[in-house]
Structure formats: C-alpha cells, structure tokens
C-alpha cells in the first residue's frame, strides 16, 4: 500500500482516484500532480514503482494538504471570529456563512429541530 502525505492509498484503485483520498487533493489536482510527475493516470496504485512513488510524493509536497490544510482552515475561521466579522459571527452561531436563507432550511448547519417543550395553550 502506497503511503503519500501520511495517507494509505487503496491498492486496487487507479492512482488518479487514489490521490483523491488525500484531504486537499481533488480530481483536477490529482491529474495535475500526475502530469507533472510524468506518471500515467491509468496505473493502479499496486503497480507503481518506487521511483514513480517518489516523484508523486515530491509533487504532493508542493501542495497544502492534510493536517497543514486543516490547520490553515481552522485558523482562518478562528481569525474571522476574533475580528468580529459577519462571517465569524455566523461561524460562531453555527449558521450558514454564505448568505443562504434560514427561515425554512439550513438544517445541516443548525442541527436537529429543538421543540419548545411544555408549552401550554
């Protein structure tokens, strides 16, 4: 099993798909990495040579992935909250950040409905 950026890639998948298991690498980035490393997208992870793995590792090191990317994102959110911006307030309250309406939807961000218990008529 190839280990790149601290992630074990599944052996049976094509390398272009296997790279997307790394947080921060999507399909387009995976294709770009393989093109720069001069490795075919159709090779299975189990068929990679050590030289090809090293080339891919060197290319992935040029990108912000896994723990570093997670840390950067969380620090950005924390910064928005500290400066008191509108987006920071929305993050703090657990509401949608990008201008969506919340009258009816936004259940994913707001969580389960909380019924008003014990309310008499």
Swiss-Prot record:
Keywords: Ribonucleoprotein, Ribosomal protein, RNA-binding, rRNA-binding, tRNA-binding. The keyword Lipid biosynthesis does not apply. InterPro entries: Rbsml_uS13_C, Ribosomal_uS13, Ribosomal_uS13-like_H2TH, Ribosomal_uS13_bac-type, Ribosomal_uS13_CS. SUPFAM superfamilies: S13-like H2TH domain. It comes from the Bacteria. PROSITE patterns: RIBOSOMAL_S13_1, RIBOSOMAL_S13_2. One of its GO terms (molecular function) is structural constituent of ribosome. The keyword Cell membrane does not apply. Residues 89-121 are annotated as: Disordered. One of its GO terms (cellular component) is cytosol. It holds the Pfam family Ribosomal_S13. Located at the top of the head of the 30S subunit, it contacts several helices of the 16S rRNA. In the 70S ribosome it contacts the 23S rRNA (bridge B1a) and protein L5 of the 50S subunit (bridge B1b), connecting the 2 subunits; these bridges are implicated in subunit movement. Contacts the tRNAs in the A and P-sites. Belongs to the universal ribosomal protein uS13 family. This is Small ribosomal subunit protein uS13. The gene is rpsM.
């Amino acid at each position: 099993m190839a280990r790149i950026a601290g992630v074990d890639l599944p052996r049976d998948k094509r390398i272009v798909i296997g790279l997307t298991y790394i947080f921060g690498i999507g399909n387009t980035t995976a294709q770009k990495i393989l093109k720069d490393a001069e490795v075919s997208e159709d090779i299975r992870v189990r068929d990679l040579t050590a030289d090809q793995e090293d080339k891919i590792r060197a290319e992935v090191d040029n990108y912000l992935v896994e723990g570093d990317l997670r840390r950067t994102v969380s620090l950005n959110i924390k910064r928005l909250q500290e400066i008191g911006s509108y987006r920071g307030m929305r993050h703090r309250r657990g509401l949608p950040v990008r201008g969506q309406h919340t009258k009816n939807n936004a259940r994913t961000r707001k969580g389960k409905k909380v019924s008003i218990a014990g309310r008499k008529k």
